[in-house]
A protein has these predicted regions:
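Substrate-binding/catalytic subdomain of NAD(P)-dependent oxidoreductase enzymes
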Residues: 4-68, 73-75, 94
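Short, exposed beta-strand "edge-strand" segments with a Pro/Gly-rich flavor and a Y/T-containing core
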Residues: 5-10, 16-22, 102, 159-172
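Catalytic, metal-anchored helix/loop core of enzyme active sites in primary metabolism
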Residues: 51-143
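A conserved regulatory-domain signal marking ACT and ACT-like small-molecule sensing domains
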Residues: 106-193
Length: 193
C-alpha cells in the first residue's frame, strides 16, 4: 500500500521492523488493564512529502476498528481524502488462507501463460523519513522510578503495576526523544488511539 500511495519503490531493507519476540506477559497485562489490545502493525504514515514506514508491536485502543481483528484475519486501514478511514479485513494468515492465495496465483499463471503483470509505480525510491521521528503516544514498561521517568519525559499516565514493572502512556512524543532521555526502559511501543 505504501508503494501504491507514493507511486515509488519502497525497499524492504529500509523498513524498520520489530517483531513480537520482546512482548512480555506484563505487556499483555498492561494492555488488558488499559482496555487495549497488543497488535503487530505495519504502518506507512505520510509526513509532508516523506513517508515513515515501520513494523512494530502497538498498543491499540479498544475503540479502534483494528482492535478486534485476531486469529487468521489480516486487516488494512486506509485514510482517503473523500471517505475518511476505511478498513478492509479477511483471512490472510494460517494454512488454509495462505494455501488459497498461493493456489489462486498458480491458477492465474496457468490460465494466462506469458501474461505480464503491470507495475504501477516508478523504480525511483520513495522518500522515507526516520520512523523514530514519528510522533505518537507511547507505552513504556520499566522498573525505574516513576518520578524520574516523568522528569525526563513529561507527564505519564501510569497503569497499575504488573510483576514489579511500571507501565504507562506518554503524551505525544517520538522514539528519538524517548531515547535521548537516556532512560533504561524495558519496552517502548507506539499507541494507536
Amino acid at each position: 500500500m505504501c508503494i501504491r500511495d507514493s507511486g515509488k519503490n519502497v525497499d524492504p531493507a529500509r523498513v524498520s521492523m520489530t517483531g513480537i519476540s520482546t512482548i512480555t506477559a506484563e505487556d499483555a497485562a498492561f494492555a488488558e488493564s488499559a482496555g487495549m489490545k497488543l497488535k503487530l502493525l505495519g504502518r506507512a504514515i505520510r509526513q509532508g512529502e516523506q513517508i515513515a514506514v515501520f513494523v512494530s508491536p502497538h498498543f491499540v485502543a479498544g475503540a479502534q476498528p483494528l482492535a478486534p481483528v485476531s486469529g487468521v484475519l489480516n486487516a488494512i486501514e486506509v485514510l482517503g481524502n473523500n471517505i475518511g478511514n476505511a478498513m478492509f479485513f479477511g483471512p490472510g494468515a494460517g494454512g488454509p488462507a495462505t494455501a488459497s492465495a498461493v493456489l489462486g496465483d498458480v491458477v492465474d499463471i496457468v490460465r494466462n501463460p506469458g501474461r505480464k503483470q503491470p507495475v504501477d509505480w516508478s523504480a525511483e525510491p520513495a522518500d522515507l523519513t526516520d520512523p523514530d521521528a514519528f510522533e505518537a503516544s507511547f507505552f513504556l514498561r520499566t522498573k525505574l522510578d516513576k518520578a524520574a521517568c516523568e522528569q525526563a519525559l513529561g507527564e505519564i499516565r501510569w497503569l497499575p503495576d504488573q510483576n514489579g514493572f511500571h507501565g504507562g502512556f506518554t503524551g505525544k512524543t517520538c522514539r528519538k526523544a524517548i531515547a535521548a532521555a537516556g532512560l533504561a526502559l524495558d519496552a517502548v511501543w507506539p499507541v494507536l488511539e
